From Swiss-Prot:
The keyword Hydrolase applies. Keywords: Arginine metabolism, Hydrolase. This is N-succinylarginine dihydrolase. The gene is astB. Catalyzes the hydrolysis of N(2)-succinylarginine into N(2)-succinylornithine, ammonia and CO(2).
Amino acid sequence: MNAWEVNFDGLVGLTHHYAGLSFGNEASTRHCFQVSNPRLAAKQGLLKMKTLADAGFPQAVIPPHERPFIPVLRQLGFSGSDEQVLEKVARQAPHWLSSASSASPMWVANAATIAPSADTLDGKVHLTVANLNNKFHRSLEAPVTESLLKAIFNDEEKFSVHSALPQVALLGDEGAANHNRLGGHYGEPGIQLFVYGREEGNDTRPSRYPARQTREASEAVARLNQVNPQQVIFAQQNPDVIDQGVFHNDVIAVSNRQVLFCHQQAFARQSQLLANLRSRVNGFMAIEVPAAQVSVSDAVSTYLFNSQLLSRDDGSMMLVLPQECREHAGVWRYLNELLAADNPISSLKVFDLRESMANGGGPACLRLRVVLTEEERRAVNPAVMMNDTLFNALNDWVDRYYRDRLTAADLADPQLLREGREALDTLTQLLDLGSVYPFQREGGGNG
């Protein structure tokens, strides 16, 4: 059956700031306490969405979360009115305010893991929300992510949205950022490659930085998503590259159809994994980047592999990259050699995503890939699909509500909280989502 990959991109939130919350993510740590520009960040993301939509790649949007997230601050013992909660936490424990204000939901590659209907036992599209257990600020996301996905994929005959796994380290799950799908045409059954960093009882694990994904979680997600067991491979990421800042697999590998584009050192027992894929995926092609040409360190600093590999109608592929790749002489030289070589990648598209990149999120972090048949695509909430009208409406919305300068100290401003809630109330109406945010359900909004 014919199917297409639709990229659902996360819209950057109003509290986008640099706080170094993500140990193991070197860009996040390096840019801690810099001044951010939320308006520019949102516009950089919107421009990527619109440019790809105009080039013929189906594109949709997932909205940001409510931030600062007052309910979690109350859970941590700060009481009073919302304004009093902000004032108290800013004075007594500002690090909690930063965590509760993180715009990290914009990286929707971590929102969920997807199984297309061609791969599932019941013929539905399955989406399992990620618990993001390893980082406090990200562990807050799952409930609202679930509400958003249910409002977007709201036809229960075609879509099953599953709640996140229990919030324990043993079941740490980081979503699609540790998941690849390989195969022929999108509508044909594919092989799902689940990538984990550690498993119980196995001493092969990183020592410097945390392995956020467990094998136990990957196995549970495959079960929840009802993936045909014949179509699943579990593979361990190389712990050495996790210790060099590769905190998700999408920082060291990206797949599309029959192609796996990855670093030579991406996986533990890599030659064995590639042989397995070669035997199970027709026409499988591994494009392994040698360490001698691009080091792991350069891959992390440029986000070469946190790229999008997109298929054109003629079977050729386009690699969507952050500007940092073009600015690195060695990486750009490699990419031009790649274009000249015998492989499906025939063009490069570069975007300026500096605001997101400074927090450790490139093009692939910002998108959730969902393979849909024509019938399934028609069942998606149409208001989230990117087109001229939505692009203009969202740009105007960003201009109206977003600040162009934000520091950690600004997070305590009650006006920022009010601006954010008003903005999200307007956005839920624009995207026809209903009341998906806690503040709306408590009567604070009219969505």
